[in-house]
Amino acid sequence: MGLSDGEWQLVLNVWGKVEADIPGHGQEVLIRLFKDHPETLEKFDKFKHLKSEDEMKSSEDLKKHGTTVLTALGGILKKKGQHEAQLAPLAQSHANKHKIPVKYLEFISEAIIQVLKSKHAGDFGADAQGAMSKALELFRNDIAAKYKELGFQG
């Protein structure tokens, strides 16, 4: 299920665009996640009270968390699948503390793809979308394996 060097290059090329505005991208990803899958909002005590898109857009906490999420994901993507050291603490916190099911990681992966398609259409064609989907699936599969090791049924 690994990615070729060419696929990793496509992933990292578009990720460079994300890094030019991590707070903006992170905010958009979380807003899309919460709009498309409102049940995910229940896992975020800081954001549960945000009901409208306008409230979400004006939330500094949401923007900060989006930055945290995409910064962590960027660090993992740059490892090109050799992300064990980065993944272990992330899996631990998401399993034991936050109780985030793997399904929600699928939902945020979808949100990431949709945001990249809307913001970077010219740099995120079918090949790049396919490569990013594979990279995010690899990440989710590895998180799921860690969850299993930790005894979390998410």
From Swiss-Prot:
Substrates-to-products reaction catalysed: Fe(III)-heme b-[protein] + nitric oxide + H2O = Fe(II)-heme b-[protein] + nitrite + 2 H(+); H2O2 + AH2 = A + 2 H2O
Signal peptide: none
UniProt source species: Erinaceus europaeus
Top-level enzyme category: oxidoreductase
Described purpose of this protein according to its UniProt entry: Monomeric heme protein which primary function is to store oxygen and facilitate its diffusion within muscle tissues. Reversibly binds oxygen through a pentacoordinated heme iron and enables its timely and efficient release as needed during periods of heightened demand. Depending on the oxidative conditions of tissues and cells, and in addition to its ability to bind oxygen, it also has a nitrite reductase activity whereby it regulates the production of bioactive nitric oxide.
Keyword Calcium in annotation: no
Protein name as annotated: Myoglobin
GO CC, alphabetical: extracellular exosome; sarcoplasm
Family the entry assigns: Belongs to the globin family.
EC number annotated for this UniProt entry: 1.7.-.-, 1.11.1.-
Binding site for heme b: H94
Gene3D superfamilies: 6.10.140.2100, 6.10.140.2110
Cellular localisation: Cytoplasm, Sarcoplasm
Self-association and partners: Monomeric.
One annotated GO molecular function: oxygen carrier activity
GO biological process: removal of superoxide radicals
Gene it is expressed from: MB
Keywords: Cytoplasm, Heme, Iron, Metal-binding, Muscle protein, Oxidoreductase, Oxygen transport, Phosphoprotein, Transport
Keyword Magnesium attributed: no
Phosphothreonine PTM positions: T68
